[in-house]
Curated annotation (Swiss-Prot):
It catalyses: an N-acylneuraminate + CTP = a CMP-N-acyl-beta-neuraminate + diphosphate. CDD domains: CMP-NeuAc_Synthase, HAD_KDO-like. Belongs to the CMP-NeuNAc synthase family. This is N-acylneuraminate cytidylyltransferase. It holds the Pfam family CTP_transf_3. A motif (BC2 motif) lies at residues 200-206. GO terms for molecular function: N-acylneuraminate cytidylyltransferase activity. Its main location: nucleus. Keywords: Acetylation, Methylation, Nucleotidyltransferase, Nucleus, Transferase.
Length: 434
């Protein structure tokens, strides 16, 4: 079961929710008032991800790469693939964030400096967005820092709003944590239990736990936002699975989130296939791109032993590794590396060569992975089932891939990509077993 959406829906005459700090910008009311004339149009539900450039905890956190994907890309992929929204937007004040949002297929609202301050609230930015978009009746405010969000979560919440008549729905997670009052010197010198009786301390399996907001999303109708609330009216919570409830705030959260998203994240509509072949560009991936020439005019290259181990790791997993280059590399020099990989050099059309290898092995494109770093790799990167690029690859290559390594070419990028492939293949195998 993907999630639990039980819980009493609370109806209130005066909306109560999380008030904004300070006075939000005045909202221009929607002329439609949420109702159409004649034939009534379905309410316009817009996904809105707030992503300002001035994050204090982690600079440009919203587009920092998590498991090879810009952080904001994880929630954009889930929102777009859910099919639950009439439009998907990113509200930002930063050019780089705008470019990433557009690459993933989102529309961009350029937020003003007035709602981009450290003191600005989410509500301020949402109200400004609505001022420019009278067509929007419902806003699904999705947090960019929740990378394990899945389309099914968003589909079910959209149904709760549209079909079950809720005015607001927000995400929660169930936790089994005992809470104690804080000790304050001079005021309270001893602590007291807040949600348990220590004399009858329950076992985890005997206790339902408590519901906490996990911050993944807040859906609210326009009329609530007009009154300054994201939670109110007829409201309900949506309980997310614990493994999907990931929030990134500070640096220490990053490695934990990375491991979680690799195992529980959403990787797209198409099911991953088992990779059978990895093709790797030589110059700039296997090597760092530097070429040394000896006194007798012999070509000398260097590579990282970690990358050789990565290649060996893939071979042990049954994945063939082949090398390719558009340059007239010395096959003798490459053979001396003892990688035992088939290779083609002086290649003018890399896609044609990879296609020939694919057919020779009886594979579909989804069973091929490619690690590239140059413009000449672009077509291959776009065609294969799994694509990657070193951290120092050209911008054309980086825009075409699904995974960007932390390591540079010739400095561990192949090993990193190999580990990424193995993790995804573990995910594929687990899915098949289920």
């Amino acid at each position: 079961m993907d999630s639990v959406e039980k819980g009493a829906a609370t109806s209130v005459s005066n909306p109560r929710g999380r008030p904004s700090r300070g006075r939000p910008p005045k909202l221009q009311r929607n002329s439609r008032g949420g109702q159409g004339r004649g034939v009534e149009k379905p309410p316009h539900l817009a996904a809105l991800i707030l992503a300002r450039g001035g994050s204090k905890g982690i600079p440009l956190k919203n587009i920092k790469h998590l498991a090879g994907v810009p952080l904001i890309g994880w929630v954009l992929r889930a929102a777009l693939d859910s099919g639950a929204f009439q439009s998907v937007w990113v509200s930002t004040d930063h050019d780089e964030i705008e470019n990433v949002a557009k690459q993933f297929g989102a529309q961009v609202h350029r937020r003003s400096s007035e709602v981009s301050k450290d003191s600005s609230t989410s509500l301020d930015a949402i109200i400004e967005f609505l001022n420019y978009h009278n067509e929007v009746d419902i806003v699904g405010n999705i947090q960019a820092t929740s990378p394990c969000l899945h389309p099914t979560d968003l589909q079910k919440v959209a149904e709760m709003i549209r079909e079950e008549g809720y005015d607001s729905v927000f995400s929660v997670v169930r936790r089994h944590q005992f809470r104690w009052s804080e000790i304050q010197k001079g005021v309270r010198e001893v602590t007291e239990p807040l949600n348990l009786n220590p004399a009858k301390r329950p076992r985890r399996q005997d206790w339902d736990g408590e519901l906490y907001e996990n911050g993944s999303f807040y859906f609210a109708k326009r009329h609530l936002i007009e009154m300054g609330y994201l939670q109110g009216g007829k409201m309900a919570y949506y309980e997310m699975r614990a493994e999907h409830s990931v929030d990134i705030d500070v640096d220490i959260d990053w490695p934990i989130a990375e491991q979680r998203v690799l195992r529980y994240g959403y990787f797209g509509k198409e099911k991953l296939k088992e990779i059978k072949l990895l093709v790797c560009n030589i110059d700039g991936c296997l090597t760092n791109g530097h070429i040394y020439v000896s006194g007798d005019q012999k070509e000398i290259i260097s590579y990282d032993v970690k990358d050789a181990i990565g290649i060996s790791l893939l071979k042990k997993s049954g994945i063939e590794v082949r090398l390719i280059s558009e340059r007239a590399c010395s096959k003798q020099t490459l053979s001396s590396l003892k990688l035992d990989c088939k290779m083609e050099v002086s290649v003018s059309d890399k896609l044609a060569v990879v296609d020939e290898w694919r057919k020779e092995m009886g594979l579909c494109w989804k069973e091929v992975a490619y690690l590239g770093n140059e413009v000449s790799d672009e077509e291959c990167l776009k065609r294969v089932g799994l694509s990657g690029a070193p951290a120092d690859a050209c911008s054309t290559a980086q825009k075409a891939v699904g995974y960007i390594c932390k390591c540079n070419g010739g400095r561990g990028a192949i090993r990193e990509f190999a580990e990424h492939i193995c993790l995804l293949m573990e995910k594929v195998n687990n899915s098949c077993q289920k």
